[in-house]
Regions:
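Bacterial N-terminal signal peptides that target proteins for export
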Residues: 1-11
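C-terminal motif of bacterial Sec signal peptides marking the signal peptidase cleavage site
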Residues: 18-21
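Bacterial signal peptide processing site
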Residues: 23-25
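Surface-exposed loop/turn elements that mediate protein-protein interactions on large endomembrane-trafficking
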Residues: 32-46, 76-101, 128-150, 176-194, ...
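Beta-strand-rich domains and repeat architectures in extracellular enzymes and scaffolds
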Residues: 46-84
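Repeated scaffold domains used in trafficking and secretory/extracellular systems
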Residues: 50-60, 105-116, 152-162, 197-208, ...
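Beta-strand C-termini and the immediately following turn/loop, strongest in propeller blades
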Residues: 65-73, 78-80, 121-129, 167-173, ...
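Blade-level signature of beta-propeller repeat domains, shared across WD40, Kelch, NHL, RCC1
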Residues: 334-364
């Protein structure tokens, strides 16, 4: 049979299939339980000739980035990063708004954008050591200067307002808590002291509006302390058997993924607290952990233990559902990703190995 005859015989079938597809999915929209394919938009990164880019924060069209190089220790036993450049980049205009060569050498590993062309960054001072213990928070603007230095660990640094950032920390003297950082300096937003009943954890920190939430251990239990703008503290103690995987602070209260043992049965719970009530979803104990929880306006993201990106959505019953994301390129499945909340209901997903950046707007 000739090729033209075959094509002619297939045309009616192809026409029917095309009409069915258009009828089932107008405008390319997917079912309400799925994520529209157009919510992920790849963004440009600043061009570099040496090293690689690491995105630390995102606010609107601005990203805070560093250019870093991976180096080996003198004995070749371990690798470390050295920051060569700090910059603020507008992904829409595709141009740099500010670029600095760090006056203080080190590994700038966390950061927060401020209003204008300024930022606050977390710095490992003894970055060539296998286990750094000298840290600083640095201001970058019209000048570069140290806001605070400590021996211990600067753990998480997050934007708090257009003029401030928050950083969780612990010192070798036993003090721990949260610093409030601005161009004017450093103050204590939450100050605790380690003793027989109180101890720091991993420095997990979350921000929502003018409130923040910090995790530590008290009397052997994981405790989440939410601090309001007026300094009021609201402590939430998890069950004695609970182990914290991750959490985030929402307008209604904390969203928590935790491992618990109840009635000799191990399980994981994704719990949303709202108006004093707990809305729980049970997850598999073995592989149900969620990390890097980020949530805003009823949607968010997290990663599982295999770096699989998970979409979070608020359900009508008040619980938060979770499913794997399949809309991104296959090579980005189960690889390291940094989830950034942009503060406007959108999120940025930075893949350091692939050097790719996406904006995600789940409600679009």
């Amino acid at each position: 049979m000739k090729r033209s005859t075959i094509l002619c015989s297939l045309l009616p079938v192809l026409l029917v299939l095309s009409l069915c597809a258009c009828s089932a999915s107008p405008s390319g929209a997917s079912d309400g339980a799925e994520t529209p394919n157009n919510i992920f938009h790849e963004l440009p990164l600043p061009a570099v000739t040496e090293g690689q880019v690491s995105v630390l924060d995102a606010r609107g069209s601005r990203i805070l980035y560093v250019r870093e190089e991976k180096l080996l220790s003198k004995d070749g036993g371990y690798a470390y990063y050295e920051t060569k450049q700090v910059g603020i980049y507008d992904v829409n205009a595709q141009k740099s708004l500010a670029v600095w060569e760090p006056e203080t050498p080190g590994n700038y590993f966390g950061g927060a954008l401020l209003d204008g062309d300024a930022a606050i960054l977390a710095l490992q001072l003894d970055y060539t050591n296998a286990y750094p213990a000298q840290f600083a928070a640095m201001y970058f603007g019209g000048s570069q200067r140290s806001l605070v230095e400590l021996t211990g660990e600067l753990q998480w640094l997050l934007p708090f307002s257009g003029k401030e950032a928050l950083a969780s920390y612990r010192t070798e003297e036993g003090a721990f808590g949260v610093y409030r950082l601005s161009a004017d300096g450093c103050t204590d937003a939450l100050l605790l002291q380690a003793d027989a009943n109180t101890e720091p954890m991993g420095g997990d920190l979350a921000v929502c509006g003018d409130r923040f939430c910090y995790a530590y251990a008290k009397n052997g239990q994981v405790t989440l302390c939410t601090v309001s703008a007026d300094g009021t503290q609201d402590a939430l103690a998890l069950p004695e058997s609970a182990k914290l995987d991750s959490f985030w602070l929402t307008a209604d209260g904390p969203l928590i993924c935790q491992y618990v043992e109840q009635d000799s049965k191990a399980q994981r719970l994704l719990t949303r607290y709202a108006s004093g009530e707990a809305h729980e979803v049970t997850r598999p104990a073995a592989d149900g952990a969620l990390y890097q929880l980020r949530f805003a306006n009823g949607c968010g993201f997290a990663v599982n233990g295999s770096w699989g990106l998970q979409l979070l959505q608020l359900s009508e019953d008040g619980t938060v559902s979770c499913r794997g994301v399949t809309e991104l390129p296959g090579e980005l499945t189960s690889v390291q990703v940094r989830i950034l909340s942009s503060g406007d209901g959108s999120f940025c997903l930075f893949y350091p190995e692939a050097q790719r950046l996406f904006r995600a707007v789940p409600n679009s």
